[in-house]
């Protein structure tokens, strides 16, 4: 973990990341960017496990590692094409919130909606609480 602070620089030197596939977590987290403890302007960062558990007491820690290392929201914004997968009935409520709620640290994945080339792929179960209007998405202005 001693060189994580240069990961973003090394990725940029190599030409960046063309496509990244990530998943939406049951509570709105992504890539270990958890509610109430994700710095929304972070590049790749390390976070002490106890910080995550204090901010999210319902989490179960099944890891002996004292730190999590992850790409923060600012790092993911540099990916050329970001793809989010949402699957399962158990994610239907959080998926609806992800689409409708304002961007916040309570639901960190909402920041991903700002990505300029963002694709969401959801199965029927995950989309089961969405209306036809929700599924159409925001209107796009045509030139």
Where are these regions (language model features)?
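Conserved phosphate- and dinucleotide-binding cores of soluble alpha/beta proteins
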Residues: 1-143
